[in-house]
Structure formats: C-alpha cells, structure tokens
C-alpha cells in the first residue's frame, strides 16, 4: 500500500502531458469512459504526483485481460498500459503536485462507501441465515430453536447494527464539513471485518447447503472478502486510526 511510490510518469510537452507506465488493479479496466490517473511529474514522494482525467479511448491506452477474481464478477479489474498517452493540460486535476492529496481526500469518502456496502452484504447474509434457520426443521422443530444457532444470529445482528451506526456517524461528520478521516477508517475496518464474520457464520448456519452454489450465502462470503482489501487494506486502516490517536510513527 505504498501508493506514493508509483512509477507511471507524465512529462510536459507544450500544452500537453505525455503519460507512460502501467497501472494495476484498475476497476472497470478496459470499459470505463474515463480514468483518474496519478502520475509522477516531479520529485520522488507524494509531492511529485499529479492527477489527470484520461479518456478511455485515448491513443496509446490499452487494457490487459481482466483478472480472474473470486468475487465482484460484474466489475472487471485489469491492468492499464499507457504508451505515450497524450492529454491536454486542461485535463489536469488540481495543481501540479496535488495529485496525492486529492487521492487521499477521495479515499476517506470511498471508505464510507465500502463500509456501507459491507453492511449491506452482511445484512443480506443474515437475512438468508434467519430464513433458513426458521424454515429448516430438525428433531421436530425449527433449528432456530437451538440456542447455539440463536446466539450466532444474535451476534450477526449486533455486529450489523454496530457497523451501521459507525458508518452513519462518520457520514454525518462528512456532511457537516467536519474532519472524518479517523471515523471513516474505523467504519471501513469494523464494517468489512463484520461482513466477513457474518457471511462465514451464515454459511455455517446453512450447513452443507451453505457451501453449494444453490444458495447465495457462499457468494456473499466471497464478495465480503474483497471489501477488507479495497480502499486500503484493514491493516492500513489500523495505521490510519493509530496515527490519529498517537501521531505518526517515529523514524
């Protein structure tokens, strides 16, 4: 997650910029109308990065074969290759050298979106688990009557409600124009970890059926996993939160 070490370069040529390099793990790679591209225009480190808006059909821009993923099948992810892609200076976003700061500001809002997605996935998994547990009968009664399973459902519901409250509080701070970076990182961390736990437990509630493609909980479990990775891994979220609490690490 060392985003500031990027190697794609943009070189000024009159009123244009010429972009050369490769980008990995690009969402909608190969089908997007536009791409927000961060490229190095100056010194090493964050201050040498500038953002550009590049049309998807720009000359010299090509996409590799999409990655074969365990989830998110509806959104292709692919490498992009920039072979002397020329864009006018009018497509520069912000000032030269502001690209990294722009990207970080977008990450905070993106983390809120991922947190909300995670709670939606978890809610869907719990709904499936409850429906199955109340309909499936063993020993003459619904399996939802068994305390061990009831406690699993209770834990699912508690994690979902806690996560929902956490990301909504961060969203309220954002809407009010207040700092929300720490809360966004907390929401992303908690909600995506909760989604992973809830979906795994939902598969367990359904037993063997949960492991088959005939029921949706296995897909929800696969979809939950990527949410712990995108918009900064959950290990990165812990670093962000800790820096807000204790300051940056000593060097």
Question: Where on the chain are the PLM-derived regions?
Answer:
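A short core secondary-structure module
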Residues: 20-64
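Flexible, small-/acidic-enriched active-site or ligand-binding loops
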Residues: 57-88
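Short, ligand-facing micro-motifs at secondary-structure edges
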Residues: 3, 62-64, 91-93, 213
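Alpha-helical interface subdomain recognition
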Residues: 3-5, 12-17, 79-81, 98, ...
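Conserved hydrophobic/aromatic beta-strand scaffold that supports enzyme active sites
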Residues: 5-9, 16, 34-38, 51-53, ...
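Long, acidic (Asp/Glu-rich), low-complexity accessory segments flanking structured domains
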Residues: 83-102
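Short Gly/Pro-enriched turn/cap motifs at secondary-structure boundaries
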Residues: 1, 25-28, 41-43, 69-76
């Amino acid at each position: 997650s060392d985003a500031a070490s990027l190697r794609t370069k943009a070189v000024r040529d009159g009123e244009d910029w010429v972009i050369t390099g490769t980008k990995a793990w690009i969402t909608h790679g190969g089908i997007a109308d536009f791409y927000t591209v961060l490229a190095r225009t100056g010194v090493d480190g964050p201050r040498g990065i500038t953002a550009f808006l590049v049309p998807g059909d720009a000359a010299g821009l090509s996409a590799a074969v999409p990655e074969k993923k365990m989830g998110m099948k509806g959104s292709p992810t692919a490498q992009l290759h920039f072979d002397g892609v020329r864009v006018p200076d009018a497509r520069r976003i912000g000032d030269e050298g502001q690209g990294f700061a722009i990207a970080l500001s977008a990450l905070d809002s993106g983390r809120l979106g991922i947190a909300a997605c995670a709670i939606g996935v978890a809610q869907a998994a719990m709904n499936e688990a409850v429906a199955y547990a109340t309909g499936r009968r063993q020993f003459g009664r619904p399996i939802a009557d068994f305390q061990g399973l009831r406690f699993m459902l209770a834990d699912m519901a508690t994690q979902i409600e806690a996560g929902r409250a956490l990301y909504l509080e961060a969203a309220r701070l954002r809407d009010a124009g207040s700092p929300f970076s720490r809360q966004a990182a907390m929401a992303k961390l908690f909600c995506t970890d909760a989604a992973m736990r809830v979906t795994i437990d939902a598969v367990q509630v359904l037993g063997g059926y949960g492991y088959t493609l005939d029921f949706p909980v296995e897909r929800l479990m696969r979809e939950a996993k990527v949410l712990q990775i995108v918009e900064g891994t959950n290990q990165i979220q812990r670093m962000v939160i800790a820096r807000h609490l204790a300051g940056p690490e000593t060097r």
